[in-house]
Each structure stands twice: as structure tokens, then as C-alpha cells.
């Protein structure tokens, strides 16, 4: 769910910039604006699910393009819910899955150079807290 709010009046408005919003990287490397119909909810698979499914589910690279120019007086408001394991929970691979299944080198092909790969941050036997700390350190 997203809404746009005029920061001067506090009123909910339509998006003043058709280019602004959530973009995802498709499996063939295209940057695609993610659009949902009104009242719909989108689910995005993250790297934790990628590890815990042994690569059956793949994380979706994404970014938000902000409003520019006179539209910058409008804010984009979203409500995100992050589902994650307990801090000390194991991030072990499921039985029968391999490191190669989970950290598919092909999936890294379309990442921007500024994005640290899953392969560089997650190692076998890490727990969720260790993985989170490695991820925060890589990006901040």
C-alpha cells in the first residue's frame, strides 16, 4: 500500500510524478516499475527466504525512485512489514540444497556494482543476527 501526501497541506494526493515509485530488477535484467492495483498487497521475497529455501525462492533486487522538482513537496508513504526469523535463529540450508543452489552466480549478473552480493555476506552456519550485521556493515 502506498499513498502520497502533500507536505504543505497534509492532504492525500495522486502521485505527481509517473516515474517515481518502486522498481524491481526482472530475471532478465530489465528495470521494471512495480505497479499494483488499488487495494492490492505486494510481497517481496528477500535474501533470508532465499537462504532458508535453498534458493527455491530468489530475492528481488529493488529500488525506489523518489519524487523530483516541484513534486518533491509530496512524500510517498508506504507500510512495509518485514517477516524474519528470531535474531539467533539458524540460517542453515534445507536438506538436499547446496550452496550453489542458494547463491546462484547468474542471479548476481544484473546487480548494480554498488550492491554487495549475497555470496559476499552470507556464509554457512551463520545465524540470522550474524547475517543481518554483515548486511548492515556492507551497506552502511
Predicted regions and their residues:
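C-terminal flanking tails of non-heme Fe-dependent oxygenases
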Residues: 1-140
Amino acid at each position: 500500500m502506498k499513498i502520497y501526501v502533500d507536505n504543505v497541506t497534509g492532504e492525500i494526493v495522486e502521485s505527481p510524478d509517473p516515474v517515481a515509485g518502486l522498481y524491481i530488477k526482472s530475471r532478465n535484467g530489465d528495470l521494471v516499475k512495480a505497479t499494483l492495483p488499488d487495494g492490492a498487497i505486494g510481497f517481496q521475497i528477500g535474501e533470508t527466504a532465499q537462504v532458508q529455501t535453498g534458493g527455491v525462492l530468489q530475492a528481488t533486487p529493488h529500488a525506489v525512485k523518489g519524487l523530483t522538482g516541484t513534486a518533491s513537496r509530496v512524500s510517498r508513504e508506504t507500510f512495509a512489514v518485514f517477516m524474519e526469523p528470531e535474531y539467533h535463529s539458524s540460517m542453515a540450508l534445507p536438506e538436499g540444497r547446496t550452496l550453489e543452489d542458494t547463491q546462484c552466480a547468474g542471479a548476481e549478473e544484473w546487480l548494480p556494482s554498488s550492491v554487495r552480493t549475497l555470496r559476499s555476506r552470507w556464509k554457512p552456519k551463520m545465524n540470522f543476527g550474524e547475517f543481518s550485521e554483515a548486511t548492515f556493515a556492507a551497506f552502511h
